[in-house]
Amino acid sequence: TPVEVFEACRAFCSEMCDDPDCRDTVIYGGNNWYYAYGKSSAREILGDSAYLAEMTEGIENRPFMVMDDGWQIDHSDSYNGGPWRVGNADYGDMGELAAQMRAKNVRPGIWFRPLYDHSADIPAEWRLERNAEVFDISVPEVLEHIAQDIRQLGDWGYELIKHDFSTYDIFGCWGFEMGTRLTNGSWRFHDHTKTTAELIVRFYEVI
Protein backbone atom coordinates (compact mmCIF):
# COMPACT_ATOMS: atom_id res chain seq x y z
CA THR A 1 0.00 0.00 0.00
CA PRO A 2 1.10 3.64 -0.35
CA VAL A 3 1.49 3.96 3.44
CA GLU A 4 3.74 0.91 3.60
CA VAL A 5 5.87 2.26 0.75
CA PHE A 6 6.20 5.62 2.52
CA GLU A 7 7.23 3.96 5.78
CA ALA A 8 9.72 1.78 3.92
CA CYS A 9 11.24 4.88 2.33
CA ARG A 10 11.47 6.56 5.75
CA ALA A 11 13.19 3.50 7.20
CA PHE A 12 15.63 3.40 4.27
CA CYS A 13 16.47 7.10 4.68
CA SER A 14 17.03 6.54 8.42
CA GLU A 15 19.52 3.80 7.58
CA MET A 16 21.40 6.14 5.23
CA CYS A 17 21.54 8.98 7.77
CA ASP A 18 20.69 8.74 11.47
CA ASP A 19 21.18 12.48 12.11
CA PRO A 20 19.40 14.32 9.27
CA ASP A 21 19.50 18.09 8.89
CA CYS A 22 15.74 18.59 9.04
CA ARG A 23 14.06 21.98 8.78
CA ASP A 24 11.30 23.26 11.05
CA THR A 25 9.36 24.72 8.11
CA VAL A 26 8.22 23.32 4.79
CA ILE A 27 10.44 24.23 1.83
CA TYR A 28 8.31 24.96 -1.24
CA GLY A 29 7.98 27.39 -4.12
CA GLY A 30 8.56 27.72 -7.83
CA ASN A 31 11.27 26.99 -10.39
CA ASN A 32 11.29 28.46 -13.88
CA TRP A 33 13.06 25.57 -15.65
CA TYR A 34 10.03 23.62 -16.82
CA TYR A 35 8.68 26.42 -18.94
CA ALA A 36 11.74 28.58 -19.63
CA TYR A 37 14.34 25.85 -20.28
CA GLY A 38 17.23 28.28 -19.88
CA LYS A 39 15.69 31.16 -21.81
CA SER A 40 14.53 33.80 -19.33
CA SER A 41 15.43 37.23 -17.98
CA ALA A 42 15.27 39.41 -14.89
CA ARG A 43 11.92 40.75 -16.08
CA GLU A 44 10.44 37.26 -16.40
CA ILE A 45 11.85 36.14 -13.04
CA LEU A 46 10.27 39.13 -11.35
CA GLY A 47 6.99 38.29 -13.07
CA ASP A 48 7.28 34.71 -11.80
CA SER A 49 8.00 36.05 -8.32
CA ALA A 50 4.94 38.28 -8.34
CA TYR A 51 2.74 35.42 -9.54
CA LEU A 52 4.08 33.04 -6.88
CA ALA A 53 3.60 35.66 -4.18
CA GLU A 54 -0.01 36.16 -5.27
CA MET A 55 -0.67 32.41 -5.22
CA THR A 56 0.69 32.15 -1.65
CA GLU A 57 -0.76 35.35 -0.22
CA GLY A 58 -1.43 35.09 3.50
CA ILE A 59 1.02 32.23 4.12
CA GLU A 60 3.59 33.26 6.71
CA ASN A 61 6.19 30.75 5.49
CA ARG A 62 7.15 32.44 2.23
CA PRO A 63 7.97 30.41 -0.91
CA PHE A 64 11.26 30.18 -2.75
CA MET A 65 11.42 31.31 -6.36
CA VAL A 66 14.33 29.48 -7.98
CA MET A 67 15.99 31.04 -11.01
CA ASP A 68 17.27 28.09 -13.04
CA ASP A 69 19.87 27.83 -15.80
CA GLY A 70 20.30 30.78 -18.15
CA TRP A 71 21.47 33.62 -15.90
CA GLN A 72 25.24 32.95 -16.05
CA ILE A 73 27.59 35.06 -18.16
CA ASP A 74 28.65 32.29 -20.60
CA HIS A 75 25.26 30.66 -21.08
CA SER A 76 24.38 29.53 -24.60
CA ASP A 77 22.27 26.88 -26.34
CA SER A 78 25.27 24.52 -26.23
CA TYR A 79 26.81 25.41 -22.84
CA ASN A 80 25.36 25.65 -19.34
CA GLY A 81 28.47 25.93 -17.19
CA GLY A 82 30.41 28.60 -15.33
CA PRO A 83 31.89 30.96 -14.46
CA TRP A 84 29.34 31.86 -11.78
CA ARG A 85 30.54 35.23 -10.50
CA VAL A 86 28.47 37.47 -12.78
CA GLY A 87 25.15 37.34 -14.62
CA ASN A 88 24.58 38.02 -18.31
CA ALA A 89 22.96 41.09 -19.88
CA ASP A 90 19.42 39.68 -19.62
CA TYR A 91 19.70 39.52 -15.83
CA GLY A 92 21.88 42.48 -14.90
CA ASP A 93 23.08 42.95 -11.33
CA MET A 94 22.44 39.62 -9.62
CA GLY A 95 22.40 41.12 -6.13
CA GLU A 96 19.89 43.74 -7.16
CA LEU A 97 17.74 41.07 -8.78
CA ALA A 98 17.69 39.04 -5.54
CA ALA A 99 16.63 42.17 -3.65
CA GLN A 100 13.84 42.83 -6.16
CA MET A 101 12.63 39.24 -5.82
CA ARG A 102 12.56 39.60 -2.05
CA ALA A 103 10.61 42.83 -2.44
CA LYS A 104 7.96 40.76 -4.28
CA ASN A 105 7.63 38.75 -1.03
CA VAL A 106 9.36 35.57 -2.17
CA ARG A 107 12.67 34.08 -1.08
CA PRO A 108 15.30 34.19 -3.86
CA GLY A 109 16.77 30.90 -5.08
CA ILE A 110 19.31 30.22 -7.81
CA TRP A 111 20.65 27.30 -9.89
CA PHE A 112 24.24 26.48 -10.71
CA ARG A 113 26.36 23.60 -11.99
CA PRO A 114 29.43 23.76 -9.75
CA LEU A 115 31.74 21.30 -11.50
CA TYR A 116 31.39 22.45 -15.12
CA ASP A 117 33.49 25.45 -16.17
CA HIS A 118 35.37 25.96 -19.42
CA SER A 119 37.03 29.24 -18.35
CA ALA A 120 40.49 29.57 -19.87
CA ASP A 121 42.03 30.79 -16.60
CA ILE A 122 41.25 27.59 -14.68
CA PRO A 123 44.55 25.74 -13.97
CA ALA A 124 45.02 22.49 -15.86
CA GLU A 125 45.74 20.70 -12.55
CA TRP A 126 42.16 21.38 -11.46
CA ARG A 127 40.72 19.53 -14.45
CA LEU A 128 39.34 16.02 -14.38
CA GLU A 129 41.43 13.50 -16.31
CA ARG A 130 38.31 12.23 -18.05
CA ASN A 131 36.95 15.64 -19.15
CA ALA A 132 38.95 18.87 -19.18
CA GLU A 133 35.82 21.03 -18.77
CA VAL A 134 34.98 19.37 -15.43
CA PHE A 135 36.62 20.05 -12.08
CA ASP A 136 38.43 17.29 -10.17
CA ILE A 137 36.85 17.24 -6.70
CA SER A 138 39.96 15.65 -5.17
CA VAL A 139 41.93 18.89 -5.66
CA PRO A 140 41.69 21.13 -2.53
CA GLU A 141 41.88 24.32 -4.59
CA VAL A 142 38.84 23.17 -6.57
CA LEU A 143 36.80 22.83 -3.39
CA GLU A 144 37.85 26.31 -2.28
CA HIS A 145 36.92 27.70 -5.70
CA ILE A 146 33.46 26.12 -5.42
CA ALA A 147 33.13 27.46 -1.87
CA GLN A 148 33.87 30.95 -3.21
CA ASP A 149 31.23 30.51 -5.91
CA ILE A 150 28.69 29.61 -3.23
CA ARG A 151 29.75 32.53 -1.04
CA GLN A 152 29.14 34.81 -4.01
CA LEU A 153 25.63 33.44 -4.52
CA GLY A 154 24.92 33.93 -0.82
CA ASP A 155 26.41 37.42 -0.78
CA TRP A 156 24.09 38.37 -3.64
CA GLY A 157 21.20 37.37 -1.38
CA TYR A 158 20.09 33.98 -2.69
CA GLU A 159 18.79 31.82 0.15
CA LEU A 160 18.40 28.50 -1.69
CA ILE A 161 20.93 27.03 -4.10
CA LYS A 162 19.94 24.31 -6.55
CA HIS A 163 23.27 22.66 -7.37
CA ASP A 164 22.90 20.40 -10.36
CA PHE A 165 24.63 17.75 -12.52
CA SER A 166 27.31 16.95 -9.92
CA THR A 167 27.29 13.14 -10.04
CA TYR A 168 26.90 13.22 -13.82
CA ASP A 169 29.91 15.52 -14.11
CA ILE A 170 31.98 13.36 -11.75
CA PHE A 171 31.20 10.01 -13.36
CA GLY A 172 30.35 10.99 -16.93
CA CYS A 173 27.06 9.10 -17.01
CA TRP A 174 23.59 9.11 -15.49
CA GLY A 175 22.57 6.64 -12.81
CA PHE A 176 20.46 4.55 -15.17
CA GLU A 177 23.50 4.16 -17.45
CA MET A 178 25.87 2.84 -14.78
CA GLY A 179 24.97 -0.83 -14.56
CA THR A 180 27.79 -2.66 -12.76
CA ARG A 181 30.20 0.28 -13.15
CA LEU A 182 29.96 3.84 -11.86
CA THR A 183 31.91 5.20 -14.82
CA ASN A 184 33.63 4.24 -18.05
CA GLY A 185 37.31 4.04 -18.88
CA SER A 186 40.35 3.83 -16.61
CA TRP A 187 40.68 7.45 -15.47
CA ARG A 188 41.50 8.42 -11.87
CA PHE A 189 41.13 11.40 -9.58
CA HIS A 190 44.23 13.50 -8.91
CA ASP A 191 44.27 12.29 -5.28
CA HIS A 192 44.57 8.50 -5.29
CA THR A 193 44.49 8.17 -1.48
CA LYS A 194 40.74 8.68 -0.99
CA THR A 195 37.76 6.66 -2.13
CA THR A 196 35.16 8.09 -4.48
CA ALA A 197 32.65 8.10 -1.61
CA GLU A 198 35.02 10.07 0.64
CA LEU A 199 35.63 12.64 -2.10
CA ILE A 200 31.93 13.13 -2.82
CA VAL A 201 31.07 13.46 0.88
CA ARG A 202 33.75 16.15 1.26
CA PHE A 203 32.45 17.92 -1.86
CA TYR A 204 28.92 18.01 -0.43
CA GLU A 205 30.25 19.17 2.95
CA VAL A 206 31.87 22.14 1.22
CA ILE A 207 28.60 23.00 -0.52
Which residues does each predicted region cover?
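Aromatic- and carboxylate-enriched substrate-binding clefts and catalytic-loop regions
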Residues: N61-I207
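Carbohydrate-recognition beta-sandwich/jelly-roll modules
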Residues: T1-P63, L160
